[in-house]
């Protein structure tokens, strides 16, 4: 009997159906000499700090850094049942071999190995490594199982990544939280990513636009423009000199150009396009693509390759043809297929590029959720474009002279639309399709050098230099991918911050931690740092916010994966860095109050409708332009020997009144009960008393 362990139940069912394990049991499937079970994501993970010593349950500076000598793995309480099932299956006497069928990547390897080792399993181990959930790919994968030991480097890299994240997260988070009296989540990749965003905002805030001026001349059939000028008076002078004059054509240059088709998608480029064209977050795109993979409609999602392998060349034309027939936007467009444009064995590591599968032929695409359908169409479009003919056009550049100045015009004539015909057809069907820029592909009239043309109009156009753009998920993913790239070795397989598999999760963590806000601006969603994010990057030392250092770590993890670096050497370097950080870092003078304490909202402001929150000295509207406040040392309340509590103020804001007991009377020296009513006159928050007339009110 052979045991197969998948990463999740849905994948296990697909595998079991192909190999004939169809009988349902408690936590697994069985049949045809196979048992198929599953993990539920990470069943086991690194233990919390207090597992090593109970004193670590409390965050104290004196306990740092926390550097475990012997790492512990623990099973999550909510996942113990499935772990126990796997442990029993692994150690069953009739099981002769265990097949790791978790996702074919770092995390999938770690998920399986953690369970395998915690279960104390000693059975021979094989690895199922597939890039598609199609039945044919599954059958081929089981026919070519690899020895599990071939992936020891992948396991080592995954475990080192987890330990590095633990070390930096636990120690840096505790250090800065203790020093600044606020929980500040710090991550090995998260913090440098945040630093990119904060730095961009600083560049935008300090940017000073520089005005410039260009002179444009209207000639018969075309408009020519001069170079940018810093002096407006000089531009006006040139305009006047050109007005009513004649322009001489100095140069006419026509070149035929070719624009190659785009490469296929890896995960990051797909996430970027899905954000730019569809408005999806990186996490949404990954989730949709993962579902399409499990539905056997797309290949493996977490890939960093944009090419296919040579053994796929012969079957590619058939796939391209059936994909084209399934996509409505390609109607009327001739489909070509040049496999060599997408074949490159040297640029495929663990998995090839993301492409649709042949199951598309029989799939009911209308039954797919809208998000999945949109991502599938994008993947299909890219495949059709990538194997299509180049986009060929002629570009004409005209240089004219007038009144001592030079003026230029460019024109474009499409000779063969090639792959762009598909892209244009796809975009034309989009609801928010961007209109083509007027004149962007306008052809110029026939002109000859030495020809003179009359200037019918001359104008001065004023512009300003543009500030850097706020990050979107599209542009941030690009920045993460290339961070530290120039300083990495040319042959480095992984450069940048994070990996295709982890970048979406990093962005979501930044949002959930309150460091990052998604703000819609017209058709895009900008990523903006919060006040606390700016404060955090202000106090973080360079080694925790440097994209270069983190990119270097990613490169080192790649070396571990390839067996070129010992895991201990990598982790020793991080431990040394943390010891130095704890031993030398001091609170930066003037930054003690950068981090505002969390403010609990108690109600709505009666003046502006904003949120009223409790601070140390009272309850204040959070809108900067509104001055509504209820002070805790308010004289009216002090005279009655009471202080407005959170519950009292909440009732006043929500209901306008609140019943209060034990109010003190200065006249009688006794206490009484009454209803306090809030009366706000727009300048001050006033209070009055109301008494129950039926019962009276003794003072």
Whereabouts are the PLM-identified features?
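Amphipathic alpha-helical transducer elements in NTP-driven molecular machines
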Residues: 9-16, 33-36, 40, 76-87, ...
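Basic, low-complexity terminal or inter-domain segments flanking catalytic cores
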Residues: 2-3, 79, 90, 118, ...
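Active-site phosphate-binding and catalytic loops of NTP-dependent enzymes
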Residues: 23-28, 123, 148-153, 174-178, ...
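Conserved short loop/turn motifs at secondary-structure junctions
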Residues: 1-3, 101-104, 181-183, 254-263, ...
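Metal- or metallocofactor-binding catalytic centers and their adjacent structured scaffolds
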Residues: 233-265, 271
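C-terminal or mid-to-C-terminal helical accessory/interaction module adjacent to the motor/catalytic core
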Residues: 93, 135-219, 254-258
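Intrinsically disordered, low-complexity regulatory segments
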Residues: 1-162, 467
């Amino acid at each position: 009997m052979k045991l197969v362990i998948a990463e999740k139940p849905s994948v296990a069912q697909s595998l079991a159906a192909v190999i004939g394990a169809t009988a349902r049991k408690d936590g697994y499937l069985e049949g045809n000499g196979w048992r198929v079970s599953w993990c539920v994501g990470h069943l086991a993970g690194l233990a919390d700090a207090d597992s090593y010593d109970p004193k670590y349950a409390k965050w104290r500076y004196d306990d740092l850094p926390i550097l475990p000598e012997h790492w512990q793995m623990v099973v999550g309480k909510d996942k113990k049942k499935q772990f126990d099932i796997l442990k029993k299956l692994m150690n069953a006497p009739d099981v002769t071999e265990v097949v790791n069928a978790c996702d074919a990547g770092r995390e999938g390897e770690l998920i399986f190995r953690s369970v395998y080792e915690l279960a104390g399993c000693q059975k021979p181990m094989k690895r199922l490594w597939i890039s598609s959930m199609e039945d044919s790919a599954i059958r081929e994968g089981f026919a070519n199982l690899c020895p599990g030991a071939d992936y020891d480097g992948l396991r080592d890299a995954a475990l080192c990544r987890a330990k590095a994240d633990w070390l930096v997260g636990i120690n840096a988070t505790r250090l800065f939280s203790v020093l600044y009296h606020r929980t500040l989540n710090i991550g090995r990749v998260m913090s440098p990513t945040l630093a990119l965003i904060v730095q961009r905002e600083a560049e935008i805030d300090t940017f000073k636009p520089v005005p410039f001026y260009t002179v444009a001349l209207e000639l018969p059939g075309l408009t020519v423009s001069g170079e940018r000028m810093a002096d407006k008076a000089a531009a006006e002078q040139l305009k006047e000199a050109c007005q009513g004059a004649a322009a001489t054509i100095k140069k006419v240059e026509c070149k035929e150009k070719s624009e190659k088709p785009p490469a296929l998608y890896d995960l990051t480029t797909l996430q970027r396009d899905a954000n730019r064209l569809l408005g999806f977050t990186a996490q949404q795109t990954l989730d949709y693509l993962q579902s399409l993979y499990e539905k056997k409609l797309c290949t493996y999602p977490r890939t960093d390759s944009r090419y296919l392998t040579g053994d796929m060349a012969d079957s590619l034309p058939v796939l391209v043809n059936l994909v084209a027939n399934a996509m409505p936007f390609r109607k009327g467009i001739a489909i070509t297929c040049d496999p060599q444009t997408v074949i490159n064995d040297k640029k495929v590591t663990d998995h090839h590029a993301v492409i649709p599968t042949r199951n598309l032929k029989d799939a009911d695409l209308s039954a797919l959720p809208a998000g999945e359908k949109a991502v599938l169409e994008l993947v299909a479009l890219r495949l059709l474009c990538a194997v299509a003919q180049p986009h060929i056009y002629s570009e004409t550049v005209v240089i004219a002279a007038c009144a001592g100045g030079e003026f230029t015009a460019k024109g474009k004539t499409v000779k063969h639309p090639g792959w762009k015909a598909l892209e244009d057809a796809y975009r034309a069907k989009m609801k928010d399709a961007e209109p083509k820029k007027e004149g962007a592909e306008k052809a110029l009239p026939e002109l000859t050098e030495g020809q003179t043309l009359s200037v019918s109009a001359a104008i001065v156009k004023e512009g300003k230099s543009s500030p850097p753009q706020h990050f979107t998920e599209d542009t941030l993913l690009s920045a993460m991918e290339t961070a530290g790239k120039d300083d990495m070795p040319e042959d480095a397989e992984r450069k940048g911050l994070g990996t295709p598999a982890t970048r979406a999760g990093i962005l979501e963590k930044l949002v959930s931690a309150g460091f990052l806000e998604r703000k819609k601006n017209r058709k895009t969603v900008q990523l903006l740092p919060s006040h606390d994010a700016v404060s955090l990057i202000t106090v973080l030392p360079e080694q925790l916010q440097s994209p270069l250092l983190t990119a270097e770590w990613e490169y080192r993890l790649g070396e571990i994966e390839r067996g070129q670096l010992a895991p201990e050497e990598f982790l020793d370097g991080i431990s040394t860095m943390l010891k130095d950080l704890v031993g030398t870092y001091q609170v930066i003078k003037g930054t003690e109050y950068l981090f505002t304490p969390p403010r609990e909202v108690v109600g709505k402001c009666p003046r502006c409708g904003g949120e009223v929150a409790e601070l140390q000295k009272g309850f204040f509207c959070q809108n900067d332009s509104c001055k509504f406040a209820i002070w805790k040392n308010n004289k009216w309340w002090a005279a009655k020997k009471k202080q407005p509590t959170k519950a009292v103020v909440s009732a006043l804001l929500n209901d306008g009144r609140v019943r209060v007991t034990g109010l003190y009377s200065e006249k009688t020296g006794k206490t009484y009960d009454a209803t306090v009513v809030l009366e706000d006159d727009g300048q001050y928050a006033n209070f009055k008393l109301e008494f129950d007339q039926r019962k009276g009110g003794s003072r």
